[in-house]
Amino acid sequence: MKVVEVKHPLVRHKIGLMREGDISTKRFRELAAEVGSLLTYEATADFETEKVTIEGWNGPVEVEQIKGKKVTVVPILRAGLGMMDGVLEHVPSARISVVGIYRDEETLEPVPYFEKLASNMHERIALVVDPMLATGGSMISTIDLLKERGCTSIKALVLVAAPEGIAALEKAHPDIELYTASIDKCLNENGYILPGLGDAGDKIFGTK
């Protein structure tokens, strides 16, 4: 599995700001979208382009445009919604596929509860977004579903990843790509990433 920890200074700075314990909901939400945007920039670097001729201000001009497979952005509910707008800045014509999965607080196992995927998944590149890759369960379940629907080109974008989650994801889906702003130290006994960001969903939506 290709794992990319994006070490751009802007990414490191913004993730550092997100770690503040008393960060406001507004600021956390803004930063989640901003880092999501920067991760998308990295994740789409291998997209192929083709030359086309358009009508410019002074006549025909040859330009490059993205070619090949269409894109679908797949936020994992609910926290993944916080990154979605940042991703769409770069791929505004992408279709949105939604997957609802929550983690059982006792077993730490993923529990699916909703799905609505774009059509023709076999023709699409999926950008799966979720702020935290902790145990990896939710991401693995989502990618299982995407593959069942025929999707073969999948990239996962997460703000923070735990080594345990990366190992689990690689074991389950060695053919995908993972882009993260930070590979953190470990999981604690409750399955939270350390140092992590806290509960990203609660911070994005202002709930507890």
Swiss-Prot record:
Lipid biosynthesis listed as a keyword: no
Catalysis performed (reactions): UMP + diphosphate = 5-phospho-alpha-D-ribose 1-diphosphate + uracil
E.C. no: 2.4.2.9
GO biological process per UniProt: UMP salvage; uracil salvage
EC class: transferase
Activity: how regulated: Allosterically activated by GTP.
Residues engaged in binding uracil: 193, 198-200
Cofactor: Mg(2+)
Manner of cofactor binding, per the entry note: Binds 1 Mg(2+) ion per subunit. The magnesium is bound as Mg-PRPP.
Functional pathway: Pyrimidine metabolism; UMP biosynthesis via salvage pathway; UMP from uracil: step 1/1
GO terms, molecular function: GTP binding; magnesium ion binding; uracil phosphoribosyltransferase activity
Pfam families: UPRTase
Positions bound to 5-phospho-alpha-D-ribose 1-diphosphate: 78, 103, 130-138, 199
InterPro entries linked to this entry: PRibTrfase_dom, PRTase-like, Upp_B, UPRTase/APRTase, Ura_phspho_trans
SUPFAM superfamilies reported in the protein's UniProt record: PRTase-like (SSF53271)
Highest taxon listed in the record's lineage: Bacteria
Coiled-coil boundaries: none
Assigned keywords, A-Z: Allosteric enzyme, Glycosyltransferase, GTP-binding, Magnesium, Nucleotide-binding, Transferase
Cited function: Catalyzes the conversion of uracil and 5-phospho-alpha-D-ribose 1-diphosphate (PRPP) to UMP and diphosphate.
NCBIfam families: PRK00129.1, upp
Family recorded in the similarity comment: Belongs to the UPRTase family.
Record protein name field: Uracil phosphoribosyltransferase
Organism: Shewanella loihica (strain ATCC BAA-1088 / PV-4)
Organism lineage string: Bacteria, Pseudomonadati, Pseudomonadota, Gammaproteobacteria, Alteromonadales
